[in-house]
């Protein structure tokens, strides 16, 4: 039976259409996915992300452990609260999961991992943490609400006490701080400013209701997906998985190659891939009528006249832009245009960088 987050009752009271999402009953939308999408781009919306897993790591060798576990390097984290995005790779360089890691003290770090990968993530982390003597605590006692949009931080701040407001005021992106009952982080999955707030399960419903009263619109998984796709953000299982290199998923920037003597899981395989080349992730824009959908083939001819085929990993109609966009994994050598096969029609598409909207503005 699918699990329910502590906010399940709030979703039903708000009129949500609930669906099974990786064994969690989650809101798909509350009536209009388009309205929810636009609320985040123009004002403030919120998402229940309590299905994600928060994992606290403690021990004197925690930093050393994470420098081995992750492709990005937590040696970069020197200021308490600073966060880092990274892939957690297998030995062949495939992506077990993408996650965020927060640094608090030398013996205390926090991971936030995806819900669909929870069990394999915890198994992998536990297996590799043992030699380092790491204490692992899964924070199932916490719920998490993402408040996103140009007015999200101001509206959320009306619920904070003086100490919380003082600490988060002017906090830069990718930081997190614990103040009282709230863990407040300047992270998100929409391409907009906002907070991701973790708080005790028993306080989540009251906090959700207070956000509604503050003018924050409840949003479901549908809007979350169109928002993240516009922002060019990967979805695990679509842009990457255990068979796909981060180099083929626009995650090359998350691999810390320096220092060269740092050994991390998957490094050896990545070195070979970097030398010989991989596929790459690109953006596609189609202004013609129609919608680019997942798994449609993408065809192009390179400069030498050779024909190649890739695949759309995520595609949708963009509510912000008013036309269809997609992320596609394609061979090297793609030019500025390609062809996508939609049923029996060959549709021309423009090839772009894999990001379409940032802070409400078109970049594609």
From Swiss-Prot:
Q: Name one GO molecular function term.
A: transaminase activity
Q: What's a Pfam family this protein contains?
A: GCV_T
Provide the top EC class.
transferase
Instruction: Name a GO CC annotation attached to this entry.
Output: cytosol
Record keywords, A-Z: Aminotransferase, Transferase
What EC number is given for this enzyme? 2.1.2.10
Q: Which NCBIfam families does the record cross-reference, listed alphabetically? A: gcvT, PRK00389.1
Q: What does this protein do?
A: The glycine cleavage system catalyzes the degradation of glycine.
**Family of the protein in this entry:** Belongs to the GcvT family.
| Record's protein name | Aminomethyltransferase
User: What gene name is listed for this protein?
Assistant: gcvT
């Amino acid at each position: 039976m699918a699990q329910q987050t502590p906010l399940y009752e709030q979703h039903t009271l708000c009129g949500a259409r609930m669906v099974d999402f990786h064994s969690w009953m989650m809101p798909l939308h509350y009536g209009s996915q388009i309205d929810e999408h636009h609320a985040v781009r123009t004002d403030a919306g919120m998402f229940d992300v309590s299905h994600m897993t928060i994992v606290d790591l403690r021990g004197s060798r925690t930093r050393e452990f994470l420098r081995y576990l992750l492709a990005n390097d937590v040696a970069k984290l020197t200021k308490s609260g600073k966060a880092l995005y990274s892939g957690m790779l297998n030995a062949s360089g495939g992506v077990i999961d993408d996650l965020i890691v927060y640094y608090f003290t030398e013996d205390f770090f926090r991971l936030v991992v995806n819900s669909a990968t929870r069990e394999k993530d915890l198994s992998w982390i536990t297996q590799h943490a043992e030699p380092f003597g790491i204490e692992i605590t899964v924070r199932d006692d916490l719920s998490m609400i993402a408040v996103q949009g140009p007015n999200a931080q101001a509206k959320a701040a009306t619920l904070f006490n003086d100490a919380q407001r003082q600490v988060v005021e002017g906090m830069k992106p990718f930081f997190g701080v614990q103040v009282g009952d709230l863990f407040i982080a300047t992270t998100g999955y929409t391409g907009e400013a906002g907070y991701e707030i973790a708080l005790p399960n028993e306080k989540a419903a009251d906090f959700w209701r207070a956000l509604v009263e503050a003018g924050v619109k409840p949003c479901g998984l549908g809007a979350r997906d169109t928002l993240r796709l516009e922002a060019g953000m990967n979805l695990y299982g679509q842009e990457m998985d255990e068979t796909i290199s981060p180099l083929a998923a626009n995650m090359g920037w998350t691999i810390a190659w320096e220092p060269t003597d740092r050994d991390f899981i998957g490094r050896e395989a990545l070195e070979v891939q970097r030398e010989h080349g991989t596929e790459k992730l690109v953006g596609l824009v189609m202004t013609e009528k129609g919608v680019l959908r997942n798994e449609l083939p993408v065809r192009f001819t390179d400069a030498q006249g050779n024909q190649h085929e890739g695949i759309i990993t995520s595609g949708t109609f963009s509510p912000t832009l008013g036309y269809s966009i997609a992320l596609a994994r394609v061979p090297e050598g793609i030019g500025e245009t390609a062809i996508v096969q939609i049923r029996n029609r060959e549709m021309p598409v423009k090839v772009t960088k894999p990001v379409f909207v940032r802070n409400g503005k078109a970049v594609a």
